[in-house]
Amino acid sequence: MTLWINGDWITGQGERRRKTNPVSAEILWQGNDANAAQVAEACQAARAAFPCWARQPFAARQAIVEKFAALLEAHKADLTEVIARETGKPRWEAATEVTAMINKIAISIKAYHARTGAQKSELVDGAATLRHRPHGVLAVFGPYNFPGHLPNGHIVPALLAGNTLIFKPSELTPWTGETVIKLWERAGLPAGVLNLVQGGRETGQALSSLDDLDGLLFTGSASTGYQLHRQLSGQPEKILALEMGGNNPLIIEDVANIDAAVHLTLQSAFITAGQRCTCARRLLVKQGAQGDAFLARLVDIAGRLQPGRWDDDPQPFIGGLISAQAAQHVMEAWRQREALGGRTLLAPRKVKEGTSLLTPGIIELTGVADVPDEEVFGPLLNVWRYAHFDEAIRLANNTRFGLSCGLVSTDRAQFEQLLLEARAGIVNWNKPLTGAASTAPFGGVGASGNHRPSAWYAADYCAWPMASLESPELTLPATLSPGLDFSRREAV
């Protein structure tokens, strides 16, 4: 029984599915997808639970969310292992994901009060009050790269605001989704407030096409995000929050500390085996001797990275990709760029056929035409050389995406120029592109999505503002508008 609908664990009636470890092929999870009728049942349960949940005092909703945080802390080691085994990422990195889930809860509570709480302004004859109200029933689509942390960034603020939810994890991480939902169950969520439906494309389409949804919160690929946007077009009454990744540039100016610049680049491009939406995909390196030295050192150090199993000792910097198919896709993207005229600086290599272990790849594309503007979700870094900083900014902005952008430079004036001209939601200076603060907005522009999911601004799209002019007394104004006559007329 792998679906949780209206407080009950039930068996899916759809396609049979199993999840294996992407490195060892060990079977981790088996179950059936939710069919369309079960998806509709989950929505009905959420709709029935909404009025009571929305009317709960905020303190009551907060108490359940904080109980969930305590359960995450108590079961941190177990959830870390589930995430690591299911995604292929090393244990150390999976542990940081669970820590981020815990920390995000306190931040979400603060954000609710700061961004969507009640505010009152006294007027001469009353008051103006701003309140916020939940949308109703929301669907949450989770990604596979952070299967606990990123859905958590939608689910927690949505529940705090008083919404009820249907959660569909990625079909590549059903085990993590189920494990997290079991902790929510133990936290004491009322039946129907949060429902779990497992499945792939058919389940997702059944969920996103429900007429009774009030909104959809999505983290994933641009292609799926665009599909959801088209599907919900002409329905302005539904909130749609999309985080769709990026084709992110990292600009490397001449710097004295080459090793520090290389370390920052490795953290930006190859952490999580390149499976972070903020990962650097395009490395823009200044022409000249220092740029040459930087690239040579980068190729040297990146070539030493050996991906390993989640539980290897010592721990590797990177583990496997989410699947062998994902690793193959990266290899195909590299070969495509070679065919276009790219010069390979470091060839990616499958550590073992049939697994998702893949070493990093680096390819120079300076002067190469028709390079696809796409997010290759893996450890493949594309390099361009530039002559001057204005050209670097032009190259950085030459994408339909706009998630993250970074600069490695000791020149503050260059960073100030980048802040003015970059088209990206996150612009970092001498910090990895993959570094983001949960107390700051997270998200981008263009094909990278809308709103700012999974962080401080998530409260904004989980509730709508209600403005009120209020007075406890009903009075006739001392001064009336022109043309109004309230004088008493004597009877004839």
UniProtKB/Swiss-Prot annotation:
Q: Name one GO molecular function term.
A: succinylglutamate-semialdehyde dehydrogenase activity
| Catalysed reactions, semicolon-separated | N-succinyl-L-glutamate 5-semialdehyde + NAD(+) + H2O = N-succinyl-L-glutamate + NADH + 2 H(+)
Which enzyme type, at the first EC level? oxidoreductase
Which ranges of the sequence are coiled-coil?
none
Hey, which pathway is this one from?
Amino-acid degradation; L-arginine degradation via AST pathway; L-glutamate and succinate from L-arginine: step 4/5
> Which positions are catalytic residues?
E243, C277
Pfam families hit by this protein: Aldedh
Q: What does this protein's UniProt record list under function?
A: Catalyzes the NAD-dependent reduction of succinylglutamate semialdehyde into succinylglutamate.
Q: Which family does the record claim for this protein?
A: Belongs to the aldehyde dehydrogenase family. AstD subfamily.
Query: What name goes with this protein?
Result: N-succinylglutamate 5-semialdehyde dehydrogenase
Task: Identify the species of origin.
Answer: Salmonella paratyphi B (strain ATCC BAA-1250 / SPB7)
